[in-house]
């Protein structure tokens, strides 16, 4: 593509960036287990865990994916591994008509654990979604058990653990350590 004409003495700098994309789908493309975007292989990689995948893939981006990439780039990251509590692709998570077997691919947690090991930071970004559903709370607890070995690199967005679409943090994130809740048995509560 030809460069625009410049007046004598003007200097113009061209910047080019390539974003590598990789996605891991089920054979029937009803589940997305991973969406990876890499724009600078020399920088840190983050993994972000949200609720469920939407329409983003290796070429198309939805608003959430765009906000994730923009904010992680500003924080100095060069790649993101996007995973979800539930791997079923849908516009909005529906627990009413779907069982956990429908919402989770059998390899979901394996993929999450593999990419948590390879990531420099693991960001819990499911926000308050599902706080009123025991099923979702159980799923969150189950996944956090798998991630306990990575507690030293678990973070949340802001003090409240926001989802990337939350208006107050869309244009700027502060990552804070994610505190793992420690389960106490009945014996330790007696004192």
Segments (PLM) and residue ranges:
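Short amphipathic alpha-helices and their capping/turn segments at secondary-structure boundaries
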Residues: 34-40, 63-80, 111-114
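Feature marks short, surface-exposed loop/turn motifs that line or immediately flank catalytic pockets
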Residues: 55, 89, 130
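Glycine/proline-rich loop-helix segments at beta-alpha junctions forming the active-site rim
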Residues: 96-191
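Short glycine-/acidic-enriched loop or helix-start segments at secondary-structure transitions
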Residues: 58, 92, 133-135
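Active-site and ligand/interface coordination hotspots across diverse enzymes
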Residues: 2-62, 190-191
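Short connector loops at secondary-structure junctions
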Residues: 78-94
């Amino acid at each position: 593509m030809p460069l625009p004409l410049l007046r004598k003495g003007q200097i113009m700098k061209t910047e080019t960036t390539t974003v590598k994309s990789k996605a891991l789908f089920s054979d029937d493309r009803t589940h997305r287990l991973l969406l990876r975007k890499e724009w600078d292989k020399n920088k840190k990689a983050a993994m972000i865990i949200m609720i469920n995948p939407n329409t983003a893939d290796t070429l198309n981006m939805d608003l959430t994916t765009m906000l994730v990439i923009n904010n992680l780039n500003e924080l100095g990251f060069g790649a993101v591994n996007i995973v979800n509590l539930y791997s079923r692709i849908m516009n909005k998570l529906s627990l009413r008509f779907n069982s956990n077997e429908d919402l989770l691919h059998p390899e979901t947690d394996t993929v999450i654990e593999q990419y948590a090991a390879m990531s420099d930071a693991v960001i819990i970004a499911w926000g308050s979604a599902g706080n009123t559903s025991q099923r979702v709370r159980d799923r969150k607890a189950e996944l956090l058990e798998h991630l306990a070995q990575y507690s030293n690199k678990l973070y949340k967005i802001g003090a409240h653990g926001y989802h990337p679409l939350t208006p107050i943090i869309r244009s700027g994130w502060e990552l804070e350590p994610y505190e793992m809740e420690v389960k106490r048995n009945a014996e330790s509560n007696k004192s």
